[in-house]
């Protein structure tokens, strides 16, 4: 059975990276100061902050209908099945748009995703491995939508500028938070970005969270792998070393997807412990 996989830029991959893996790619759109960029094509997480400035006016939107139809028309006859794994349906209209369009095609399956970033990549590598072992396509397709309750993903913005610009934090609240050195702690859980709590000082909060996570999962550490994602944080090596010391494993370091960085701003860091086999991590390191 010949299967095509389609991802979007919420995975954190560029079109070139996805294609090297043998996957197809749909860019989400990022508007910066009234100019639209195709994420993963016109910009990526390496040059994003050369374009996005502190006071930039920004917004994000789903892939264009024309681009989706063009891709689907191109690949539907070349494969027995097409699996499309978009950004979490709770964060964007991308899933709804794809699902409506896919109804016109017999072999295109849209995953009702609760994932983004490296979690999407992990799910797809596991899916490919299972299909390669002749597991049921329908059963493995269902697993792509499953959220693992044991995993924890926490996100901490270093600055509040992007939260203010995006209307997620008032200027008055941001000013008070700056004086008090309060930082928000956001969790990504079951496909949603939710408030987890708050801390005092970015560095203190992050090191404390790394220590807390490491302690919580220490008894089952052989089955979990540490991951750090960041938006060009200049002090990333410090947190990498802290995770290594606390958990006993060197974390995988990745960049936050641009469609997330536009809302969290420069310096933001996400940390996670994910239950995954080492061969999956090795594939991520090798290909991405």
From Swiss-Prot:
InterPro entries (UniProt xref): DegV (IPR003797), DegV_C (IPR043168), DegV_domain_contain (IPR050270)
Q: Does the keyword tRNA processing apply?
A: no
Query: Which GO terms fall under molecular function for this chain's record?
Result: lipid binding
The residues the record assigns to binding hexadecanoate are 61, 92
* PANTHER family xrefs: DEGV DOMAIN-CONTAINING PROTEIN DR_1986-RELATED (PTHR33434), FATTY ACID-BINDING PROTEIN TM_1468 (PTHR33434:SF2)
Entry function: May bind long-chain fatty acids, such as palmitate, and may play a role in lipid transport or fatty acid metabolism.
The protein here is known as DegV domain-containing protein MYPU_3590
